[in-house]
Amino acid sequence: MSTTGKSGQNIKVQQLLLDIQSGDTTKVIKAIRGLESHGNNSALEPLLHFWKTVTNSDIDRELSEFFAALKDTDSRHEIMEVLLNEEVEDFRIKILASIWNCKVDYSDYLAQFVTLAAEGGFMEALECLTVIENLDGPYEEEQFFESQIALKNYLENRKSSTDEKAQLMSEIAIIVKDLEDNHDDF
């Protein structure tokens, strides 16, 4: 793509991001749909931060569909950067749900999902379990090591964690062990 083409696309993306902030539901939904066609990964972080503030169910649904439709593996970095940010802690469940609903493989982030499950509440652990169950691999040995450390820390520092969360963490530990055993077979 020419420099002018990239510049034109960036201007279009910036305009669509401005339209999202308009407060007009029709305009916001049209802008989200425009980002599906004209957007690039630079729009993901501001869009995720906007989603955190959304109270309109139509806009929320449109954003859920937008993130579930992602196919570009390069989008993973921006989404994980927002997901791991403590400022979105109360919003992580939606981001995690969008991750397991999309077609992008997040296998490179196995350890981060295990850590989020260990450090978060029951619903975060449930969403992380679903993400982990849907990972395709392959995995680096370091992912297993970091996952085991997160699981060990969870067991050592577990306070009054619910029985349900403890069960989820047990399931995650079994999956990680199975993934590691299958990894060792190659």
Task: List PLM regions with ranges.
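Short inter-helical turns and helix N-cap capping residues of alpha-solenoid HEAT/ARM repeat scaffolds
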Residues: 23-24, 55-56, 87-88, 120-121
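Structural detector for internal amphipathic alpha-helices that build alpha-solenoid repeat scaffolds
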Residues: 2-7, 28-38, 49, 58-72, ...
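Residues at alpha-helix boundaries and short interhelical turns
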Residues: 54, 86, 103, 159-162
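General structural signal for alpha-helix termini and helix-helix connectors
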Residues: 53, 119, 134-137, 157
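N-terminal acidic leader/helix
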Residues: 16-23, 118, 122-129
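Short acidic, glycine/proline-enriched loop segments that cap or flank alpha-helices
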Residues: 116-120, 138-139, 160-163
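Alpha-helical oligomerization segments
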Residues: 141-147, 153-186
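Amphipathic alpha-helical scaffolding segments comprising HEAT/armadillo-like alpha-solenoid repeats
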Residues: 2-19, 38-51, 72-85, 105-118, ...
